[in-house]
Amino acid sequence: MAEYANIIVDIFNEKLDKTFQYRIPEAMKEKLTLGMQVYVPFGKRNIKGYVVELTDEPEFEVAKIKEIIGIVTDSVPIESQLIALAGWMKKNYGATMNHALKTVIPIKKKSNAVEHKSVRLKLTEIEAKSELAEFERKHQKARVRLLSALIENPQMDQSMITQKLNVSGTVIRALETMGIVEVVSERSYRNPVSHLDSKGYHLTLNEEQQSVVDAIERNLDQKIAKTYLIKGVTGSGKTEVYMELIAHMLAHGKQAIVLIPEIALTFQTVMRFYNRFGDRVSIMNSRLSPGERFDQFERAKNGDVDIMIGPRSALFTPFSKLGLIIIDEEHESSYKSETLPRYHARETAIERAGMCGASVVLGSATPSVESYYKAKTGEYELLELKHRVAEKPLPKVEVVDLREELKAGNRSILSVRLQELMEDRLKKGQQMMLFINRRGVAGFVSCRACGHVIKCPHCDVSLSQHVTRQHPEGKMVCHYCGYEIPMPKTCPACGSRYISGFKAGTQKIEMIVKERFPQARVLRMDMDTTRNKEGYEQILSAFANQEADILIGTQMIVKGHDFPNVTLVGVLAADLSLYVSDYHAAERTFQLLTQAAGRAGRGSEPGEVVIQTYQPDHYSVQAAKEQDYEAFYEQEMEYRRMLLYPPVWNMLVILCASKWEQTAYDSAKLLVQEIDTWQENIKAAMERVGEDFKKKRVFPVGPADPAVAKVNDIYKKVIYIKTKDYQTLVELKDRLEHYMRDNRAFKDTVVQFDFNPMSGF
């Protein structure tokens, strides 16, 4: 049993955002567990704190370590659960406890309360009329107006009194002092979905959907908690399945969290859930104000809502009766955090569910290779929806070879075939979507005379060309650090006038489409057009209401949206996601192409899809054309096995970053040496007891430059480590953290760990 507890005190002060050590009383040693709330002496007072670590190692002189006073008996259990989850994240993803706590309890600081004030009459009607007569005798007109109104309506909103009756706060306070009225204040929680209209919408499931629901509900009724993977083709009605499962949980007094991959999904998803469940639904996303975010956590904590919808941060909603976590589009890379701790929402959801006996449902038309592998090996239960609802056919997919287009003299980003189909849809009054995974006008700008590419001086990346109202001639922007300059008229290297952008982005596509189809109404949706809070909703609403014929956008337009009048989808450059130094490149390409194709033909008319590419024979393109997930999975797994990549193997990436390139390299080199030493020690210890070293063996590669070796004047070096056993990587991470703790060689280097990364550094 541990002798000491490291505790985070419950004070909203950045300077105190660290652990303090306390001695555990003998009578408390068997009761105290990780995540519990306790009372501790702090300065001259006693306050609450959270147990985040139990240890036998004193950090100070034993005589100076104070003792825990007691365990909080009436604490909200969910808070302790989230603290325990933070401890798990710290252990498994490599970050400080403070990083983990700020992730699982993102609202550590109370927002300014939104107060709703009303004025209430304290007197009987006879007493009030007597006071009114006195005010009239003294010609106190404001008091007469107020008291007359309150005799008619004994409680009124204070803002209405001040605005409509023209009664000042001074008059209200005077009557309050006289004991005639009282001012009542209530906390008013902001509800980001209060403007939606609940219709009690409910769809009858088809046989296939009902079969999936029944399979899960049988286990739920028997209190068997599992992780399920629903593999359902686009348009198969996964959302209706989710809602039926949630209704089942609500009927049993449980709560549910629904994760979405991007904020772009919130508008349509919330509308469908709100139509079914009304104000029991709330949303959590990064575009809410701090006050709105705080209010949603308070509403969840108080039990005012039962369903929270949002991106990965919604996973930490403080529900006390959590019964179900749904992760829609579970394959999305946005579920993996790119900041410390670099957690994956899927793994973390499964861990949280395990803490409270909840179930997890993963859903996708194109499951991640990792999830499908776990379903195939029995770790998850696989359930399938093989048909679209109402037996609607999957869209017809054509692949256009852009090399042949160029040979035929077509230099436009729009192939001849795509232009023909667009013309046809405009004549029929049908809608279409054009997808390209690139913002701006040009992916990079280069000189055709000398080949010079204009790069960011602070980052190892090319600048992108953008056109705005403020910069109609264009500007150059770095998408990593925000650096920007005006578009140069001549090459900075050789002075040539032949300088221009390559690889058209969304802005350029918009210009080309408007020029080619001047009669068309065009909308563009990317990060540049959706920067304000309502940007997504406005664009999606306009397109859903058929106020535009063509929607052009980046990957956010292909994420689960349902537009029945869309009968044509054009993927303009399928190769862009293949040109990435990342072992997920083919998987992402297949997923994007399949998801994009799934937007077509969801209404009464059949859909068509045109995929434009320079690599028509690539297996990800061919599998997407045939919409054959199994064929893609088998080919991809062969590649992963051959190159020792997840999910067959596990990978740890160690990033070393410094202001000085040599320092970053030297730090990485020291870590590689320590890895070798650790591995030799493990090997010797295992051989002494006759154990097989193979399962613990790791294969380090590096130090090496990542795909982007410098960002914002910070140099990066990486080490890649592969092994079959995930826990071995966790043990290695712990060893390296201990090695670096008091090592001055790392004082100018930031070291981060990323387990099974979703993208290259």
For the regions a language model picked out, list residue spans one by one.
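Short, intrinsically disordered low-complexity segments
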Residues: 37, 46, 690-727
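Intrinsically disordered or highly flexible coil/loop and linker segments, enriched in small
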Residues: 95-99, 110, 155-156, 431, ...
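Inter-lobe coupling/hinge segments of SF2-like helicase ATPases
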Residues: 199-206, 210, 214, 223-665, ...
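Short beta-strand elements
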Residues: 678-706, 747-756
